[in-house]
Amino acid sequence: MMAPQTTRNDPRQRGQEAEERARAYLEGQGLQTLARNFRTRRGEIDLIMADGGVTVFVEVRRRSHPGYGGATASVDRRKRQRLSRAASAWLARHPGWARFDVVATDGHEVHWVRDAFREES
């Protein structure tokens, strides 16, 4: 049996492309990549970056159509809680200051929202 081919219509591939664009953009802004797709039982973080002495947990959102609402608004309470729990696991091993950012891509532009939300329990 042959593996299915991935195409530009594959949501996973589009998500990976959005994450790569976000990573390249943030590195261009002076941040350093610490980890990609950090997974725990509690959740996953798309990108973990360093901005000076601050650890930045980045949620990447791809929106194909502005009518679906803003990418930042799509990070609902449940998603914020999962991100917070995964971030706690990272910070248990790498203590320090941290913030949560959202990077939204629409295929052509990258929008970076620094300190998009606070940790939730």
Swiss-Prot record:
Recorded family membership: Belongs to the UPF0102 family.
Coiled coil: none
Full protein name: UPF0102 protein Hhal_2103
Alphabetical list of Gene3D superfamilies matching this protein: 3.40.1350.10
Region: Disordered, residue numbers: 1-20
Example GO molecular function: nucleic acid binding
InterPro entries: Restrct_endonuc-II-like, tRNA_endonuc-like_dom_sf, UPF0102_YraN-like
Compositionally skewed regions (Basic and acidic residues) per UniProt: 9-20
Xref: Pfam families: UPF0102 (PF02021)
PANTHER family cross-referenced by the UniProt entry: UPF0102 PROTEIN YRAN
